Amino acid sequence: MKIPILPVVALLSLLALHAVQGAALGHPTIYPEDSSYNNYPTATEGLNNEFLNFKRLQSAFQSENFLNWHVITDMFKNAFPFINWDFFPKVKGLRSAAPDSQ
């Protein structure tokens, strides 16, 4: 099932606007003991190598598909199959070997 993108974007922007207006109207109660300096950890954590996998990041930047727009667009199309990708205008000359005459 293909979902048209324009109504989805309009609905999401309406929901975001409603949430922002609701957040602006609310009066949160601020407790000073919740935001004190004593609640924060004293020791610095430093670099956590468990979450910074540099070898994986380097291999991603050195691959042939890095900044390959064909692969990136195909990845987005496969990640979001419910979006009607035929709705968007095609950019001339991107998929053909020779650019189309303008």
UniProtKB/Swiss-Prot annotation:
Q: Which UniProt keywords apply?
A: Differentiation, Secreted, Signal
Which residues belong to the signal peptide in this entry?
1-22
Bridged cysteine pairs (disulfide) = none
Q: Name one GO biological process term.
A: cell differentiation
Q: Which Pfam families has this protein been placed in?
A: KRTDAP
Principal localisation: secreted
* Protein localization: Secreted
Tissue specificity comment = Expression restricted to suprabasal keratinocytes of the epidermis.
Q: Name one GO cellular component term.
A: lamellar body
The role this protein plays is: May act as a soluble regulator of keratinocyte differentiation. May play an important role in embryonic skin morphogenesis.
> What is the official name of this protein in its record?
Keratinocyte differentiation-associated protein
Gene source species: Mus musculus (Mouse)
